[in-house]
């Protein structure tokens, strides 16, 4: 049975009792289970196996993973400490290739190691503080994204039906959520009638996680299979689409969970606004466009053997990309903590 959990208390990554506590998202919604992580190897496995997932949450988890790795380093010599910490960073970078927040957070932690503290113990303390700050900043960022999203949602009808894909909620961030943050803000303002949640094959994050979050929050939610979205749009059941992003190129192309591109095409066809909600830390200004975003391919067992039950005969081949790229031309606006931005204006924000 699902443990009763208040939405406001859903924090997928926490620092508690000198270790990291993760909500095991592979067990939701049937079981609410927390997992204690005490070393960077365990954190790397948790990220790769999707115990923790969602680009911002992965970034927070990686930051704590860096501290866990630093804590275990025995040397007191600064140069050797940095060398060993860079090894930890390399191991964590290999866990998930698409979500840029992971790389951003690791770089933030390395920057602390390079430029703060006069001794190793001081650097270790600074690394823990930095990880905690990354977590706090992301929570505040998500709240700001929610407020910014509320401002750009369609004015009519007053109560909207919003379609979302995968899970860009509290479970995918430090808390509150990006796309679900916008939905939550709309619900609090009396502007939301209902959420339609794609199940999101093959991992079913929509069915398992987004629906779970909405139920916890008391938000009306309707689950649909991915191939029902076009019909729902044609029947005028959808007023707006709001999704998250795992990486955004400087031209406004975005990589998000597989199936997002198809939704954007459908939304364009039906003249439905398509919004992407993500923090600026998800923008990779080093990439000119979405063709340069690395796309993770996962074990095909996720396709042919969902929930441990094989559904496809032997002899077939499989293709299991975890993400696809949505061109900027299909996106109405990218909702960030600094407000909603037209995709073509994103490069103007580069520091």
Swiss-Prot record:
One of its GO terms (molecular function) is S-methyl-5-thioribose-1-phosphate isomerase activity. The keyword Amino-acid biosynthesis applies. Its EC number is 5.3.1.23. The keyword DNA damage does not apply. The record marks 166 as: Transition state stabilizer. Gene3D superfamilies: translation initiation factor eif-2b, domain 1, Translation initiation factor eif-2b, domain 2. SUPFAM superfamilies: NagB/RpiA/CoA transferase-like. One of its GO terms (biological process) is L-methionine salvage from methylthioadenosine. The active site is at 246 (proton donor). InterPro entries: IF-2B-related, IF-M1Pi, IF_2B-like_C, Initiation_fac_2B_a/b/d, M1Pi_N, NagB/RpiA_transferase-like. Pfam families: IF-2B. Substrate binds at residues 53-55, 96, 205, 256-257. Keywords: Amino-acid biosynthesis, Isomerase, Methionine biosynthesis. It comes from the Bacteria. Belongs to the eIF-2B alpha/beta/delta subunits family. MtnA subfamily. Catalyzes the interconversion of methylthioribose-1-phosphate (MTR-1-P) into methylthioribulose-1-phosphate (MTRu-1-P). This is Methylthioribose-1-phosphate isomerase.
């Amino acid at each position: 049975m699902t443990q009763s959990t208040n939405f406001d208390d859903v924090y997928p990554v926490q620092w508690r009792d000198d270790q990291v506590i993760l909500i095991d998202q592979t067990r939701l919604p049937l079981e609410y289970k927390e997992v204690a992580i005490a070393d960077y190897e365990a954190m790397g496995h948790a990220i790769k196996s999707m115990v923790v997932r969602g680009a911002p949450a992965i970034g927070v988890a990686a930051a704590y993973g860096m501290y866990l790795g630093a804590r275990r380093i025995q040397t007191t010599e600064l140069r050797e400490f940095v060398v060993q910490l860079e090894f930890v960073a390399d191991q964590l970078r290999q866990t998930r290739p698409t979500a840029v927040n992971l790389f951003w957070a690791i770089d933030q932690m390395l920057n602390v190691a390079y430029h703060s503290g006069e001794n190793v113990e001081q650097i270790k303390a600074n690394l823990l503080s930095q990880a905690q700050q990354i977590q706090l900043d992301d929570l505040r960022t998500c709240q700001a994204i929610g407020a910014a999203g509320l401002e750009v949602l369609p004015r009519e009808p007053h109560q909207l039906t919003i379609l979302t894909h995968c899970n860009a909620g509290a479970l995918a961030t430090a808390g509150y959520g990006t796309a679900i943050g916008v939905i939550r803000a709309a619900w609090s303002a009396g502007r939301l009638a209902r959420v339609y949640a794609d199940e999101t094959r093959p991992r079913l994050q929509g069915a398992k996680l987004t629906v779970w979050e909405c139920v916890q929050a008391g938000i009306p939610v309707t689950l649909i299979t991915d191939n029902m979205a076009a019909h729902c749009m044609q029947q005028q059941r959808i007023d707006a689409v709001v999704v998250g992003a795992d990486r955004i190129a400087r031209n406004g192309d975005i990589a998000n969970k597989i199936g997002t591109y198809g939704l954007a095409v459908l939304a364009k066809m039906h003249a439905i606004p398509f919004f992407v909600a993500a923090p600026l830390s998800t923008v990779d200004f080093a990439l000119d466009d979405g063709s340069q975003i690395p796309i993770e391919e996962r074990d095909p067992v996720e396709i042919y053997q969902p929930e441990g039950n094989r559904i496809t005969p032997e002899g077939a081949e499989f293709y299991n990309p975890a993400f696809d790229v949505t061109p900027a031309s299909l996106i109405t606006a990218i909702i960030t903590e600094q407000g909603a931005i037209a995709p073509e204006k994103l490069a103007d924000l580069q520091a």
